[in-house]
Protein backbone atom coordinates (compact mmCIF):
# COMPACT_ATOMS: atom_id res chain seq x y z
CA UNK A 1 0.00 0.00 0.00
CA UNK A 2 1.23 3.49 -0.81
CA UNK A 3 0.81 6.49 1.48
CA UNK A 4 1.98 9.26 -0.84
CA UNK A 5 0.62 9.91 -4.33
CA UNK A 6 2.79 12.37 -6.28
CA UNK A 7 -0.24 14.04 -7.84
CA UNK A 8 -2.34 14.17 -4.69
CA UNK A 9 -0.06 14.14 -1.65
CA UNK A 10 -0.86 12.05 1.40
CA UNK A 11 -3.28 9.16 0.88
CA UNK A 12 -4.48 6.26 3.06
CA UNK A 13 -3.63 8.17 6.25
CA UNK A 14 -6.56 6.48 7.99
CA UNK A 15 -4.56 3.25 8.21
CA UNK A 16 -1.79 5.07 10.07
CA UNK A 17 -4.21 6.75 12.47
CA UNK A 18 -5.77 3.35 13.29
CA UNK A 19 -2.37 2.17 14.55
CA UNK A 20 -2.40 4.99 17.12
CA UNK A 21 -5.53 3.94 19.01
CA UNK A 22 -3.55 4.07 22.29
CA UNK A 23 -4.10 7.85 22.15
CA UNK A 24 -7.86 7.38 22.52
CA UNK A 25 -10.81 7.84 20.21
CA UNK A 26 -10.13 9.63 16.93
CA UNK A 27 -12.51 12.61 16.76
CA UNK A 28 -11.04 14.52 13.80
CA UNK A 29 -8.34 14.03 11.21
CA UNK A 30 -6.80 15.81 8.27
CA UNK A 31 -4.04 15.61 5.72
CA UNK A 32 -1.86 18.17 3.98
CA UNK A 33 -2.60 20.75 6.69
CA UNK A 34 -0.62 23.91 7.30
CA UNK A 35 0.76 23.59 10.82
CA UNK A 36 2.20 27.06 11.18
CA UNK A 37 0.15 30.23 11.05
CA UNK A 38 3.21 32.27 10.16
CA UNK A 39 6.15 31.13 8.09
CA UNK A 40 8.86 32.89 6.16
CA UNK A 41 10.68 32.38 2.87
CA UNK A 42 13.45 30.43 4.63
CA UNK A 43 10.97 27.88 6.00
CA UNK A 44 10.89 24.72 3.91
CA UNK A 45 8.33 22.93 6.08
CA UNK A 46 4.87 24.23 6.79
CA UNK A 47 2.49 21.55 5.46
CA UNK A 48 2.04 18.43 7.60
CA UNK A 49 1.24 15.06 6.05
CA UNK A 50 -1.39 13.71 8.48
CA UNK A 51 -2.93 14.79 11.77
CA UNK A 52 -5.34 13.17 14.17
CA UNK A 53 -7.17 14.68 17.12
CA UNK A 54 -7.73 11.99 19.74
CA UNK A 55 -9.73 12.15 22.96
CA UNK A 56 -9.12 9.98 26.02
CA UNK A 57 -10.42 10.62 29.55
CA UNK A 58 -11.64 14.10 28.59
CA UNK A 59 -8.24 15.15 27.27
CA UNK A 60 -7.68 15.92 23.59
CA UNK A 61 -4.31 15.23 22.01
CA UNK A 62 -3.11 16.36 18.61
CA UNK A 63 -0.95 13.77 16.85
CA UNK A 64 1.15 14.66 13.80
CA UNK A 65 2.55 12.11 11.35
CA UNK A 66 5.27 12.82 8.81
CA UNK A 67 5.23 10.16 6.08
CA UNK A 68 8.37 9.17 4.18
CA UNK A 69 7.11 6.65 1.63
CA UNK A 70 10.36 6.17 -0.22
CA UNK A 71 12.99 3.44 -0.62
CA UNK A 72 15.86 5.19 1.20
CA UNK A 73 16.06 4.81 4.99
CA UNK A 74 15.17 7.79 7.18
CA UNK A 75 18.17 9.33 8.95
CA UNK A 76 18.35 10.59 12.55
CA UNK A 77 18.84 14.17 11.29
CA UNK A 78 15.60 14.05 9.28
CA UNK A 79 13.84 12.53 12.30
CA UNK A 80 15.05 15.31 14.64
CA UNK A 81 14.12 18.03 12.14
CA UNK A 82 10.55 16.79 11.81
CA UNK A 83 10.19 16.29 15.56
CA UNK A 84 11.18 19.92 16.10
CA UNK A 85 8.86 21.17 13.35
CA UNK A 86 5.74 19.18 14.26
CA UNK A 87 6.48 19.54 17.98
CA UNK A 88 5.61 23.24 17.83
CA UNK A 89 1.94 22.35 17.35
CA UNK A 90 1.48 18.65 18.22
CA UNK A 91 1.26 16.77 21.51
CA UNK A 92 2.71 13.64 19.89
CA UNK A 93 4.85 13.30 16.77
CA UNK A 94 5.34 10.18 14.65
CA UNK A 95 7.53 9.47 11.67
CA UNK A 96 6.21 6.81 9.29
CA UNK A 97 8.59 5.16 6.85
CA UNK A 98 9.51 1.89 5.16
CA UNK A 99 13.06 1.91 6.56
CA UNK A 100 14.85 3.69 9.41
CA UNK A 101 18.58 3.92 10.11
CA UNK A 102 19.42 2.48 13.56
CA UNK A 103 19.95 5.89 15.22
CA UNK A 104 16.38 7.02 14.50
CA UNK A 105 14.97 4.84 17.29
CA UNK A 106 17.08 6.76 19.83
CA UNK A 107 15.56 10.17 18.95
CA UNK A 108 13.82 11.11 22.21
CA UNK A 109 10.06 11.71 22.21
CA UNK A 110 9.59 10.70 18.55
CA UNK A 111 7.28 7.80 17.72
CA UNK A 112 7.92 5.50 14.77
CA UNK A 113 5.48 3.73 12.46
CA UNK A 114 6.53 1.14 9.90
CA UNK A 115 4.65 1.55 6.63
CA UNK A 116 4.88 -2.22 6.19
CA UNK A 117 1.60 -3.19 7.80
CA UNK A 118 1.44 -0.42 9.03
CA UNK A 119 2.76 -1.21 12.52
CA UNK A 120 3.69 0.87 15.54
CA UNK A 121 7.43 0.45 16.18
CA UNK A 122 7.87 2.99 18.98
CA UNK A 123 5.33 5.07 20.90
CA UNK A 124 5.85 8.84 21.06
CA UNK A 125 6.16 10.78 24.32
CA UNK A 126 3.95 13.78 25.09
CA UNK A 127 5.41 17.15 24.12
CA UNK A 128 4.45 20.68 25.20
CA UNK A 129 3.40 22.44 21.99
CA UNK A 130 2.68 26.13 21.61
CA UNK A 131 -1.00 26.70 22.39
CA UNK A 132 -1.57 28.96 19.38
CA UNK A 133 0.02 26.44 17.02
CA UNK A 134 -2.08 23.62 18.49
CA UNK A 135 -5.28 25.62 18.10
CA UNK A 136 -4.36 26.62 14.54
CA UNK A 137 -4.03 23.01 13.36
CA UNK A 138 -7.11 21.76 15.24
CA UNK A 139 -9.32 24.52 13.85
CA UNK A 140 -8.31 23.57 10.30
CA UNK A 141 -9.26 19.94 10.91
CA UNK A 142 -12.43 20.51 12.90
CA UNK A 143 -13.81 24.04 12.40
CA UNK A 144 -17.24 22.86 13.47
CA UNK A 145 -16.24 22.12 17.07
CA UNK A 146 -18.67 24.00 19.31
CA UNK A 147 -16.00 25.11 21.75
CA UNK A 148 -12.33 25.81 21.56
CA UNK A 149 -10.27 22.60 21.60
CA UNK A 150 -9.47 21.08 24.98
CA UNK A 151 -5.75 21.25 25.49
CA UNK A 152 -3.57 19.79 28.26
CA UNK A 153 -2.54 23.31 29.32
CA UNK A 154 -6.02 24.86 29.15
CA UNK A 155 -7.06 26.51 32.42
CA UNK A 156 -10.47 27.97 31.54
CA UNK A 157 -13.38 27.14 29.28
CA UNK A 158 -13.40 29.11 26.05
CA UNK A 159 -16.39 29.70 23.79
CA UNK A 160 -16.65 29.46 19.99
Question: Could you describe each region identified by the protein language model?
Answer:
Residues 1-8, 18-28, 100, 105-160:
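Non-catalytic C-terminal interaction segments of nucleic acid-processing enzymes
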Residues 23, 57, 88-89:
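Alpha-helix C-cap/termination motif
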Residues 24-43:
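A short acidic/basic microdomain associated with nuclease active sites
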Residues 27-28, 34, 49-53, 62-64, ...:
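Ordered hydrophobic segments in well-structured contexts
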Residues 46:
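Beta-rich catalytic cores
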Residues 50-52, 58-76:
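Conserved catalytic cores of phosphodiester-cleaving nucleases, focusing on short active-site segments
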Residues 69-112:
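Catalytic cores of nucleic-acid endonucleases
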Amino acid sequence: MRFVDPGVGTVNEGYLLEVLSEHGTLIASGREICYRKEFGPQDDRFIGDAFGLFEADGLRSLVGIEIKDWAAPVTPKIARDYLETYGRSCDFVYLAARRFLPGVASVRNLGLISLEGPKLKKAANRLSPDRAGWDFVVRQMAPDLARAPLHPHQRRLMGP
